[in-house]
């Protein structure tokens, strides 16, 4: 298990980002999807939790075979997807990623949003605080992103919002910018497979970090597109975009219903687990194991002995070996 806490500051308020994150997730998913690969929305419905209150439950399938490194593609099926389940009780959210093909793989993300510059060292509960983890600050203006994802129009150093006047962020902007908020994300990655655990967990964290950086940059760079939206308007945008995304990747499900009014009973949707636990395995998985030596099953003798032709008359065998008719029991 590899645990890291990411802190991503934004030149927004927590109330503003409630709309911004929904808009960004929908648009980003649509842009990153293509025929056969991308994000398929399976469910998006209201959810009620006895502890956290009213929220929104979403389930998605993330098809990403071509985005895997070559060493990973060698051991996964051609049609490969990760299941994402998210419970949004904004400003608190839980997201879990699992894969039926890799039962020992899971990602658990616990997120909290606050109006500060990432200075709260005790934002997560005492149990999480006691776990050894690395705290990583992500700077949307100054941290480098993979070159293939770079767009000058989405670069906070160059972009300036016409509606809010915010933008063109410079190094050190977090120290004096107002307003400012922070996304605190506690990310647990598990891949408890002998021989691959460290490599896979480190790779997944690198991917998670890149996605967080790109997504938060886009949420700010698109602020003029969503800033005046109401919750009903962003939900309608979400519904239309998700249907278009499903068609884009070749999935044609029934129309997606998104509502923030009617609430489903808590028994309808399973609540999120804590970081999904998987038993520690010290043995290599079956598909990586060296075949075991097993004794051969003998369906026939290794040598075949034919009867001596000179003795066949005395063997009392069927006509294949003798011209005599086979013996039959005497009738009483």
Swiss-Prot record:
One of its GO terms (cellular component) is cytoplasm. It catalyses: a 1,2-diacyl-sn-glycero-3-phospho-(1D-myo-inositol)(in) = a 1,2-diacyl-sn-glycero-3-phospho-(1D-myo-inositol)(out); a 1,2-diacyl-sn-glycero-3-phosphate(in) = a 1,2-diacyl-sn-glycero-3-phosphate(out). Pfam families: IP_trans. The modification Phosphoserine is found at residues 119, 122, 270, 274. One of its GO terms (biological process) is signal transduction. Keywords: Cytoplasm, Lipid transport, Lipid-binding, Nucleus, Phosphoprotein, Transport. Residues 272-281 have a biased composition (Low complexity). The modification Phosphothreonine is found at residue 278. Residues 272-332 are annotated as: Disordered. One of its GO terms (molecular function) is phosphatidylinositol binding. Belongs to the PtdIns transfer protein family. PI transfer class IIB subfamily. This is Cytoplasmic phosphatidylinositol transfer protein 1. The lineage of its organism: Eukaryota, Metazoa, Chordata, Craniata, Vertebrata.
